[in-house]
Amino acid sequence: MALEALPPKPGLGMTAELHLEDVQRAVDVELQEHRPQRVLPAEWAPQSAVQLTWPHADTDWRDLLAEVTETYVRLAYEIASRQPLLIVSPEPDEVQSLLSRRLPAAALQNVHFVAAPSDDTWARDHAFLTVLSDNGAELLDFRFNGWGGKFAAERDNAINRRLFDTGWLHGHYVSALDFELEGGAIESDGAGTLLTTAACLLNPNRRLEGDAVPVPDRGQVELLLRERLGAERILWLHHGYLAGDDTDSHIDTIARLCPNHTIVYVKCDDPADEHHAELQAMEAELEALRTADGRPYHLLALPMPDAIHDEAGARLPAPSANFLSMPRAVLRPTYRR
């Protein structure tokens, strides 16, 4: 996977770094007009740090470890050049030694290392979800089960508690292990609206007997999201997928909430492509969605990357929407295209 660092795009509601403060003030004003008592901040909101869970020989990247490590070095550079970076690794000394040779001193000073065993690298899915409330920052530790039991996740599921016990994170630890929820399964606008997919959140493989919501019941799931994340509106998509995707249609692979009532989404214009019908149906769903004040969202389409296949000929997911938003940059995958 190649990586491209982009300045904030006008289509995403950010004109350029020069005007970022003006845009941030506009977003802040919007949130002040309606700020829930509990809120899951939007990804583009100011961040105390970005977490990377570093690849190693026991992760799913083992056969491509050298190449993938190079991508992570580039990720570390792009993030740490702009803001603090938290790196979780079972061998943090080795990672620190590598980055000390590859990153400039100013960026390296922004990197904090934590030792923790891990199964894989999907930090967005196994990391804390931070909710802001009248009590300050609440670090919600939801259960991660390897996307419905497809992969081992016991070590990933223990990272949050280990991180909190280091004392480096600021906020109140809140155990939410009675509910399986991955960060990539939900999008928040920071003002009470969540966007998600039924294929993931209502999938029986995410629910367990004895959980807070033991069955895939939409009403019960919505109630839990309202209580724990402060959601006031939950927008559901029932269409859209990527072939080969293990996440059961994570929203962060197909459609993303962005500033200024914008949704960026994956579009497929090739009628011969297997995704065409589903993504067309998803586009129609997005066109029907409304903001909290009843207006249609601004929709910005991302082109579907050319098909990528593994050595056996199976199609691999290449989610162009699976980018990382930071206050001063957007990092997006390019898949060498």
Placement of each model-derived feature along the sequence:
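The feature marks the mature, well-folded catalytic cores of soluble enzymes
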Residues: A2-R337
